Amino acid sequence: MSDINATRLPVWIGCSPCVGDDCIALLTRGEG
């Protein structure tokens, strides 16, 4: 995972805990 994503993940999860899983799934798909 790139540094940019590593920095954004905590922010998205902190702002939208319920959508955290969706964001991670989208990021993993983009990275993969």
From Swiss-Prot:
Keyword Methyltransferase assigned: no
Residue ranges crossing the lipid bilayer per the database entry: none
Molecular function (Gene Ontology), one example: toxin activity
Domain of life: Eukaryota
Positions of crosslink type Cyclopeptide (Val-Pro): V11-P17
InterPro entries for this protein: Amanitin/phalloidin (IPR027582)
Chain positions listed as propeptide in the UniProt record: 1-10, 18-32
Keywords: Toxin
Modification after translation, per record: Processed by the macrocyclase-peptidase enzyme POPB to yield a toxic cyclic heptapeptide. POPB first removes 10 residues from the N-terminus. Conformational trapping of the remaining peptide forces the enzyme to release this intermediate rather than proceed to macrocyclization. The enzyme rebinds the remaining peptide in a different conformation and catalyzes macrocyclization of the N-terminal 7 residues.
NCBIfam families documented for this protein: amanitin
Main function: Probable toxin that belongs to the MSDIN-like toxin family responsible for a large number of food poisoning cases and deaths.
Similarity comment text for this entry: Belongs to the MSDIN fungal toxin family.
Protein name per Swiss-Prot or TrEMBL: MSDIN-like toxin proprotein 2
Organism whose genome encodes this protein: Amanita fuliginea (East Asian brown death cap)
